């Protein structure tokens, strides 16, 4: 029996409709916390995909990317599904290394900010990490907010504090020696330690728990020149460029210890700084924080 070309076309269609999907993928990128990983989907005979990255996150994109926010061992699964609903699943194990720098995530109702804690200020870094690991900050408020200046939090008295209560005097019962580092300045997003005034604290020791994040305002070359003359130090070219580009609060330099910097989530900082406040600069809505160590 002679088979026509049409026969082979029909046969190919039948065979392809019976073919089961094949699930397969590779991944590209550095396997480290906060480094994006791109997945190369090499599946066959599939029209839909279900990814599970092993950390509670999923995707239905054909070729997704994913960023892990905690180190550890994870199992990634990909389900490839054809148009008839038949499916195949493949899994691969991945080990995510911790970040090369000290990072914390500050969560709020307006989003999250990722903050680097500097190795150059070891006492402040160690103390902040200790408090974070103890859960000290969880549920505390950003109790003082001044747009174009800063947002301040970390007072233990702010937890469940009723509206109208004066805040800002609480702490863990100790202070920390100042750690002024010439290279660390109050550009937008800088995290620094709050403290009591010079009259009662001439050594400029830092609060054991209260901190602020600089929102700042625009800074001009004239502003920096005046501060250099008043305070008797010189900004580096890089510091001047950072202030001119991002703004900040340079008048606080060398008076308050800068020990970190926001590296992600500036739009969240802007939202927090813009909330309505009462005459004491306390936000009218409670801005609760939850801080965790990225490791």
Outline where the language-model segments fall.
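Bacterial Sec-dependent N-terminal signal peptides
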Residues: 1-26
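Intrinsic disorder/low-complexity detector
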Residues: 7-10, 42-43, 54-59, 84, ...
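A ubiquitous, low-specificity "background" feature that marks scattered single residues
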Residues: 8-10, 47, 216
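Cyclophilin-like peptidyl-prolyl cis-trans isomerases
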Residues: 18-20, 32-38, 44, 65, ...
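Surface-exposed, proline-enriched loop/turn segments that connect beta strands in immunoglobulin-like
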Residues: 24-28, 53-54
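Surface-exposed, flexible coil segments in extracellular/virion-facing regions
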Residues: 48-66
């Amino acid at each position: 029996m002679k088979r026509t070309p049409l026969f082979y076309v029909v046969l190919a269609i039948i065979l392809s409709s019976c073919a089961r999907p094949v699930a397969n993928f590779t991944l590209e990128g550095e396997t480290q916390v906060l480094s994006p990983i791109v997945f190369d989907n090499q599946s066959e005979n599939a029209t839909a995909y279900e990814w599970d990255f092993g950390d509670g996150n999923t995707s239905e994109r054909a070729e997704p990317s994913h960023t892990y926010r905690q180190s550890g061992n994870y199992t990634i699964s990909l389900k490839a599904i054809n148009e008839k609903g038949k499916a195949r699943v493949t899994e691969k194990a991945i080990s995510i290394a911790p970040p090369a720098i000290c990072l914390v995530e500050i969560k709020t109702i307006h989003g999250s900010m990722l903050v680097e804690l500097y190795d150059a200020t070891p006492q402040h870094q160690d103390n902040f990490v200790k408090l974070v690991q103890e859960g000290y900050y969880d549920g505390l408020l950003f109790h003082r907010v001044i747009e174009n200046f800063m947002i301040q939090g970390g007072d233990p008295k702010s937890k469940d504090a009723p509206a109208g209560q004066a805040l800002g005097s609480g702490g863990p019962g100790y202070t920390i020696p100042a750690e002024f580092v010439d290279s660390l300045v109050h550009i937008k997003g800088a995290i620094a330690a709050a403290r009591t005034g010079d009259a009662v604290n001439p050594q400029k020791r830092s609060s054991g728990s209260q901190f602020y994040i600089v929102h700042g305002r625009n800074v001009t070359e004239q502003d920096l020149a005046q501060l250099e003359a008043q305070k008797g130090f010189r900004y580096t070219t890089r510091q001047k460029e950072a202030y001119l580009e991002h703004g900040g609060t340079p008048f606080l330099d060398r008076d308050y210890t800068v020990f970190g910097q926001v590296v992600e989530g500036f739009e969240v900082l802007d939202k927090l700084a813009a909330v309505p406040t009462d005459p004491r600069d306390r936000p009218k809505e409670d801005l609760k924080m939850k801080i965790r160590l990225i490791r």
